[in-house]
């Protein structure tokens, strides 16, 4: 959905997309946090989301629903819709619970609005010349840093994209955000990650979405795929378990 995001130093329109599968019950909560958005959902799921939208008394003009297929197909459909409007694409997972920022002058993180987070990301992207932006990969404030990193993994739960030519690899069903980060670094030599913006999602435990596809074999298959595509010098083990990786950038 086309939205206008304005700030003191920066203002523009963006396309807000929520990537979802099998979780129509999340529509009300996401609307309260995010506002108007287009929901990109799995094949043959639209009617369930339409029913949930009606039960939640949400406006069809503010909560649009598009059947777009699997995970990466949905991500790419959102990018292409943003391209048609000539605006950056904001993609969110469907289980956002809160957005905060960690000030170096405060002991605890402070809540911020969705629009404010987008403004900060876009301002930093423009300032450093990046075309993919995002937030800290964990919502744990212990790991927050008052800095922007230009060579770092951008977790796909909250991303801003303004290069419409780079698309997600539709051969992937998991860990597609690692590949997408590398595509941007390969082409543009940088990304933009705000390590002081913390977004809390429930995707590790919430049913549906990518979690429903997350099995040990699929995780390992996607890791092998990434290693073949980018090399073992770039795709490194995390040291925590065999299902997690890190990028050597």
Where do the model's predicted regions map?
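Conserved catalytic core of nucleotide-sugar-dependent glycosyltransferases
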Residues: 98-182
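C-terminal catalytic/acceptor-binding lobe
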Residues: 1-26, 172-174, 178-249
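Short, solvent-exposed loop/turn segments at secondary-structure junctions
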Residues: 23-24, 70, 95-97, 138-141, ...
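Short coil/turn segments at beta-strand junctions that form active-site/ligand-binding loops
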Residues: 12, 35, 85-88, 189
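A structural signal for short, well-ordered beta-strand segments and their strand-loop junctions
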Residues: 89-92, 131-136, 191-195, 235-237
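A short acidic (Asp/Glu
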Residues: 27-29, 49-52, 100-103, 143-149, ...
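Active-site-proximal specificity loops/subdomain of glycosyltransferases
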Residues: 40-92, 97-110
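Basic, amphipathic N-terminal segments that precede the first structured/catalytic domain
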Residues: 1-72
């Amino acid at each position: 959905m086309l939205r206008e995001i304005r700030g003191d130093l920066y203002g523009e329109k963006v396309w807000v997309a929520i990537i979802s599968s099998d979780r129509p019950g999340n529509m009300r909560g996401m609307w309260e946090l995010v506002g108007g958005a287009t929901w990109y959902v799995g094949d043959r799921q639209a009617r369930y989301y339409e029913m949930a939208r009606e039960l939640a008394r949400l406006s069809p003009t503010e909560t649009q629903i598009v059947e777009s297929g699997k995970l990466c197909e949905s991500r790419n459909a959102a990018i292409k819709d943003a391209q048609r409007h000539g605006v950056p694409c904001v993609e969110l997972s469907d289980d956002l619970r809160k957005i905060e920022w960690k000030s170096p002058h405060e002991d605890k993180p402070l809540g911020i609005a969705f629009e404010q987070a987008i403004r900060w990301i876009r301002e930093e992207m423009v300032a450093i010349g990046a075309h993919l932006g995002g937030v800290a990969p964990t919502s744990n404030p212990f790991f927050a840093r008052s800095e922007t990193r230009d060579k770092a993994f951008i977790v796909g739960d909250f991303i801003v994209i303004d290069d419409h030519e780079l698309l997600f690899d539709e051969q992937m069903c998991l860990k597609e955000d690692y590949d997408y980060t590398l595509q941007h670094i390969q082409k543009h030599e940088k990304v933009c990650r705000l390590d002081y913006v913390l977004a809390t999602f429930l995707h590790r435990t919430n049913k549906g979405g990518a979690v429903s596809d997350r099995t040990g074999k699929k995780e390992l298959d996607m890791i092998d795929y990434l290693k073949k595509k980018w090399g073992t010098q770039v795709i490194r083990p995390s040291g925590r378990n065999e299902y997690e990786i890190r990028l050597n950038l």
